[in-house]
């Protein structure tokens, strides 16, 4: 029997999932510090045009994720988590290779489409976590998963910024090596976590994005939680979508400074998720913890909308760490409303919602920023995206307060 056939309680199961999510996050964040100047160099574009190109790039990546996420989630329910995660890792490695070789804006966009297609592994990865943890422990474990994502946000942008001195594409070669190493690790040591009796045939109706949404619509309380998650996803995307552009337009930061700023945010959020999330959820409950996190996030968004100095920006990076309560709390609320056989589909639904939010985000956040940093704008206001994010978060808080309190299926 191969190591892959080992029991799901094998310590390699959770370890591999954490590394995979870390690499997914790193792949998402790797390009952030170098993206503005990479687009300006490759496309010979001014900053406002590069912001606009970045919006189209984000839309293409989000559309790919929107399609792929529920497919991967349902495939993981039918085939098991192991096969789907290994395929996604192979695709992630291909994505890094394309970005490393990119010599045009079109190639960069194509590389980000691959990121969207194979970044949908977040859903199957979370489903694997649900397979091997009890319902009462899931909020804490999802907090650890979110911490892995936060660490990826540290490693990705920091690596992108630090290696940018060796060229725009150097970070992608480093990430390619890491992705291939994790693929080999999973191929040999990652066990299957989904029991055969809990698998179900692949369904095209469930695998399309709107079929996944029907799952939420049919379950008590799940629809509103899904809508809250969608609003939160749109608002929280203000950082990955606009931060690098905002830092250049508002504060004149270098690629290295942008990478270090992402690293600081990632460190504070990861520490918060490890040491605060589990305790806060147990003390406050999932709903109240999510509300508290969103209130802190909205205050941070307003602060960045008005920020005019590096010192204030640095202080806000530490203060916004409380937003780490939101994602794991909402994910735990969704997971509680699904049975064991639905966990892959529910996590696919969550990933689909994130993909849909990523489609809305570039239009709602990045496009206005491109306008308010262009010569045609009546005022120069790079912080417009943060102001919009604050309003969206306030709407999410209001909607969550109306969600039924039932916590089980």
Name each region found by the language model:
Residues 67-80, 272-286:
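Helix-to-loop junctions at the C-terminal end of transmembrane segments
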